[in-house]
């Protein structure tokens, strides 16, 4: 009888250990808004408006914001989305080489991972591309599905507020062997938009039925020189 009681206690303890509540994400308020005007070849696709979480990752947000305005003499205007993978993400921000091997931050060529408090929990999240730990520069990506395997590896710092259809259009653009769009997709203009006080709460998920892509999609188009 004592043996069964002991086994029961152990089972309860194990269950309590494995069924612990997940640590909740901090409330992410939108502190800054920025935009991209997008062109595909000579055709205007429209505007993407993004909200940034400056209270959670202020250094990462300031880097992206300043590169949108170009106030430091360098920035995203004129650069292109060099890597597009359907059911995964769209990647840009390499304004020095344009192929995923360049880019630089406002702090120098690279800067450390600020924190990983925010997760890739839904489509249209804005996150830093990198080539490994503490190698953030200017390259970024926008998710088009849930990408939870990137949690703890890439710094989430914002989300798309308007222009999700533009992101979808970029995601579905024809691509070459290295996942680069066959027709250049460029950031024709970029800048900052004033934030109203009523806009400081994180936006609702844009796609309720989003699913994670299959494992083979996660590595498609990846090379040793690519940042993600």
Curated annotation (Swiss-Prot):
Family affiliation: Belongs to the cyclophilin-type PPIase family. PPIase B subfamily.
Motif Prevents secretion from ER, residue numbers: 225-228
GO biological process: protein folding
Chain intervals with Basic and acidic residues compositional bias: 194-228
Protein name listed in UniProt: Peptidyl-prolyl cis-trans isomerase B
Signal among keywords: yes
Stored PANTHER family: PEPTIDYL-PROLYL CIS-TRANS ISOMERASE (PTHR11071), PEPTIDYL-PROLYL CIS-TRANS ISOMERASE D-RELATED (PTHR11071:SF561)
Domain PPIase cyclophilin-type positions: 35-192
Glycosylation, residue list: 136
GO cellular component labels: cytoplasm; endoplasmic reticulum; endoplasmic reticulum lumen
Compartments, as annotated in UniProt: Endoplasmic reticulum lumen
Source organism superkingdom: Eukaryota
Catalysed reaction equations from the record: [protein]-peptidylproline (omega=180) = [protein]-peptidylproline (omega=0)
InterPro entries per the UniProt record, alphabetical: Cyclophilin-like_dom_sf, Cyclophilin-type_PPIase_CS, Cyclophilin-type_PPIase_dom
Enzyme Commission designation: 5.2.1.8
Pfam family, one: Pro_isomerase
Main location: endoplasmic reticulum
Activity regulation as described: Inhibited by cyclosporin A (CsA).
Gene name as annotated: CPR2
Chain segments carrying region Disordered: 172-228
Record key words, sorted: Endoplasmic reticulum, Glycoprotein, Isomerase, Rotamase, Signal
Signal peptide extent: 1-24
């Amino acid at each position: 009888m004592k043996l069964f009681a002991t086994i029961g206690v152990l089972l309860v303890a194990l269950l309590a250990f494995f069924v612990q509540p997940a640590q909740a994400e901090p409330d992410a308020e939108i502190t800054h808004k920025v935009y991209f005007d997008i062109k595909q070849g000579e055709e205007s696709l429209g505007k993407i408006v993004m909200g940034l979480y400056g209270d959670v990752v202020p250094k990462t947000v300031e880097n992206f914001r300043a590169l949108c305005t170009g106030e430091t003499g360098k920035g995203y205007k004129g650069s292109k989305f060099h890597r597009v993978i359907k059911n995964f993400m769209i990647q840009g921000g390499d304004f020095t080489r344009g192929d995923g091997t360049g880019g630089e931050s406002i702090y120098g060529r690279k800067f450390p991972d600020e924190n990983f408090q925010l997760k890739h929990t839904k489509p249209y999240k804005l996150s830093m591309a990198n080539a490994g730990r503490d190698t953030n520069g200017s390259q970024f990506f926008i998710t088009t599905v849930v990408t939870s395997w990137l949690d703890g590896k890439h710094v989430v710092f914002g989300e798309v507020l308007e222009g999700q259809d533009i992101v979808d259009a970029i995601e579905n653009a024809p691509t070459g062997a290295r996942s680069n769009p066959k027709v250049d997709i460029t950031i024709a203009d970029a800048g900052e938009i004033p934030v109203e006080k009523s806009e400081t709460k994180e936006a609702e998920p844009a796609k309720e039925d989003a699913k994670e892509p299959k494992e083979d999609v996660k590595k498609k188009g990846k090379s040793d020189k690519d940042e993600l």
